[in-house]
From Swiss-Prot:
<dbReference type="Pfam" id="PF00709">
    <property type="entry name" value="Adenylsucc_synt"/>
</dbReference>
<feature type="binding site" description="in other chain">
    <location>
        <begin position="13"/>
        <end position="16"/>
    </location>
    <ligand>
        <name>IMP</name>
    </ligand>
</feature>
<feature type="binding site">
    <location>
        <begin position="298"/>
        <end position="304"/>
    </location>
    <ligand>
        <name>substrate</name>
    </ligand>
</feature>
<protein>
    <recommendedName>
        <fullName>Adenylosuccinate synthetase</fullName>
        <ecNumber>6.3.4.4</ecNumber>
    </recommendedName>
</protein>
<feature type="binding site" description="in other chain">
    <location>
        <position position="302"/>
    </location>
    <ligand>
        <name>IMP</name>
    </ligand>
</feature>
<feature type="binding site">
    <location>
        <begin position="40"/>
        <end position="42"/>
    </location>
    <ligand>
        <name>GTP</name>
    </ligand>
</feature>
<feature type="binding site" description="in other chain">
    <location>
        <begin position="38"/>
        <end position="41"/>
    </location>
    <ligand>
        <name>IMP</name>
    </ligand>
</feature>
<feature type="binding site">
    <location>
        <position position="304"/>
    </location>
    <ligand>
        <name>GTP</name>
    </ligand>
</feature>
<dbReference type="InterPro" id="IPR027417">
    <property type="entry name" value="P-loop_NTPase"/>
</dbReference>
<feature type="binding site">
    <location>
        <begin position="330"/>
        <end position="332"/>
    </location>
    <ligand>
        <name>GTP</name>
    </ligand>
</feature>
<feature type="active site" description="Proton donor">
    <location>
        <position position="41"/>
    </location>
</feature>
<dbReference type="InterPro" id="IPR033128">
    <property type="entry name" value="Adenylosuccin_syn_Lys_AS"/>
</dbReference>
<feature type="binding site" description="in other chain">
    <location>
        <position position="223"/>
    </location>
    <ligand>
        <name>IMP</name>
    </ligand>
</feature>
<feature type="active site" description="Proton acceptor">
    <location>
        <position position="13"/>
    </location>
</feature>
<dbReference type="InterPro" id="IPR001114">
    <property type="entry name" value="Adenylosuccinate_synthetase"/>
</dbReference>
<comment type="similarity">
    <text>Belongs to the adenylosuccinate synthetase family.</text>
</comment>
<dbReference type="GO" id="GO:0046040">
    <property type="term" value="P:IMP metabolic process"/>
</dbReference>
Length: 429
């Protein structure tokens, strides 16, 4: 197969960075198609840990480098900070390609994000306040500033003046906040444009040319299916399409070009921010999972909400994202546990259901129906093959695959690239 998409099948933070790094060593290029620096990913290579929010994970191994597609919203300051850190560690970034159609996060987007969240009080969404939502709002309103605009002084000046007039009216009259100054932004972002110029191109052409040559292309999704603007737990979602269908529009290619869609999940479930979470654990078991797995946000540092594995949510993700392979991470967390639970269905107002409700009110009333499985005592962090896994670990994995209806291709037993058990090579599916 020449085109593999990796998508989060839960609420993000599933460990997509690890599997994309693992797969990218055989890829010609790694491509990111949505989101911005609200989506943190951690890569561990040897004794080095890389925490990134914008640059694709495949920058470390893909033969022709990494691509940032038109569906991504770019904070130039964050991007260049990451690139500088990578260069200091000896990582070759010369193969980076940035879409000329990608939208740029401006200072007023970050402020708007912050002011809106503050104004909502108890009804806040729980955004990372990085300006992602307001940037996508401007994109949909057709007033956004794109990467190509930063390369044209007159175009950028006109758009920035127009947008600042609107944003400053909002800030001063609605939020009672100070106005932003044109001169504090204009030259700084023009300079970003010039610094970015050597990487900027029509990435749709780059990616489609690679696919036409039957080169292996790895598509990296950001966040997770349950945060998709259409298919997730709306309004507690992100501002972009995180399902595999969003990859096509976020790159500029036909949806039929994807061969395999790998859904990445944890052996349990986590969520950051507000919103329904049927299997959430608010007890010492949840605390134990959180501390064992170091479940704190890469971007915010916030403790993640923790719950048991939810096969109802996974089946929803499978259907809407076209997932046909599963990559499960953090199996090692359950070593030493007595038992593990899997939600096989929900109970809603006394009735058993096997679907994921659209209504928030219904979701908040849903109670998980659990199936209990025995855990294992063995340390599995050095296990390399399926055969060497404890029998109870195999039973758990088989049950997950059976309930979701998708075969497992990889199982992770630790953070390092080498701590990955490959059941089937996705490039050969």
């Amino acid at each position: 197969m020449t085109a593999i998409a990796v998508v989060g099948s839960q609420w993000g933070d599933e460990g997509k960075g690890k599997i994309t790094d693992f797969l990218s060593k055989d890829a010609a290029m790694a491509v990111r198609s949505n989101g911005g620096n609200n989506a943190g990913h951690t890569i561990e290579i040897g004794d080095k840990t890389f925490k990134m929010r914008l640059i694709p994970s495949g920058i470390f191994a893909a033969k022709k480098g990494a691509v940032i597609g038109n569906g991504v919203v770019i904070n130039p300051e964050v991007m260049f900070g990451e690139l500088d850190n990578l260069e200091k560690e000896g990582i070759d970034i010369s193969g980076l390609k940035i879409s000329n159609r990608a939208h740029v996060i401006m200072p007023y987007h970050i402020l708007q994000d912050t002011y809106q969240e503050e104004a909502k009080g108890d009804k806040k969404i729980g955004t990372t306040k990085n300006g992602i939502g307001p940037c996508y709002m401007d994109k949909a309103s057709r007033i956004g500033i794109r990467v190509c605009d930063l390369l044209e002084r007159d175009t950028f000046e006109e758009k920035l003046r127009t947008n600042l007039a609107e944003k400053n009216a909002l800030f001063t009259k609605v939020y009672n906040k100070p106005a932003l100054k044109f001169e504090d932004i204009f030259e700084k972002y023009l300079e970003y444009g010039q610094k970015m110029k050597k990487y900027v191109t029509d990435t749709s052409v780059v990616v489609n040319d690679a696919l036409d040559k039957n080169e292996k292309v790895l598509f990296e999704g950001a966040q997770g299916v349950m945060l998709d603007i259409d298919e997730g737990t709306y309004p507690y979602v992100t501002s972009s399409n995180t399902i595999s269908g969003g990859i096509a529009s976020g790159i500029g290619m036909g949806a039929n070009r994807l061969n395999t869609v790998i859904g990445v999940c944890k052996a349990y479930t986590t969520r950051v921010g507000e919103g329904p979470f049927p299997t959430e654990l608010l007890d010492e078991v949840g605390d134990r999972i959180r501390e064992t797995a170091h479940e704190y946000g890469t971007v915010t540092g916030r403790p993640r909400r923790v719950g048991w594995f939810d096969s109802v949510a996974l089946r929803h993700a499978k259907r809407v994202a076209g997932i046909n392979a599963l990559s499960l991470n953090l199996l090692d967390v359950f070593s030493g546990f007595d038992k593990i639970k899997i939600a096989t269905a929900y109970e809603l107002d006394g009735k058993k259901i096997d679907y994921y409700p659209a209504s928030l009110k219904e979701l908040y009333r849903c109670k998980p129906v659990y199936e209990e499985l025995p855990a294992w005592d063995e340390d599995i962090t050095n296990v390399k093959t399926w055969e060497d896994l404890p029998e109870n670990a195999k039973k758990f994995l088989n049950r997950v695959s059976e309930l979701v209806g998708v075969p497992l291709v990889t199982v992770s037993v630790g953070p390092d690239r080498e701590q990955t058990i490959v059941l089937k090579n996705p490039w050969e599916m």
